[in-house]
Amino acid sequence: MRKPLFYATITKTFEHKKGGKDVYLSSEYLKQFDKDLYYKILLLESFEDQAWHTAAQLAQVVQLDARSVSKYLNELSKNYQQFSGKTHPLFTKNHRSGYNFYDTLDSIEHERFLIYLVQSTLKFQLLHDIFFEEFHTMYQFAQKHYISESTAHRKINEWKQQLQTYGIRLQRGTYIAQGEEEIIRLYLHMTFWQLFRGKIWPFETISQMDVKNMAEHIMAFFNVRLNEIKKRRLEY
């Protein structure tokens, strides 16, 4: 009997540690996914020491100019207010000391905020709508996300180049994903795992309970027991 496509990968998991503790989502995973999200999470990682940082200091760390750093910090504060419903910003600013967290985020809130940031990106919305067949026209997508059609075109063209390296194409006009089914499934598996690592179930049209039961049957068939992280990856 042929083994499932992902059987060879279920014994490995992505691990990232910073300062001796596990970090759910590293900016390293995001270099090829979304530039703005990459810099935002890189900046969030910079505040894990709970210290004050000036825009100039942060600019050296993330290799941006100070103005861009300030822009991303302001955007993060707005993102946090939208995510949490709170009125205070994510960061507090001191003329001399620079920036620091207004309130320390607990680990659960931190993870949920990262998930919110990922799901809020145009790249994720594009990936979601195309692979789950909710993308109808460029105009409809642009209207749905309050962007211009030219911005939508630019995002799709950037993504097309990345997909081509996996042998996946987007059909002209309809933007339906084309390629070997196993490759498309593997691409979705890798992408969703790197972005969420089992923290949420991103497959809206698939019953999570059915997949859990299927994973149990697979483990029983191969007579293996996996820890929760590896089991979640198998389910993905």
Predicted features, each with a name:
Residues 6, 18, 22-236:
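A cross-family "folded-core" feature that marks the main globular domain of proteins
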Residues 8-13:
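Ala/Thr-enriched low-complexity intrinsically disordered regions
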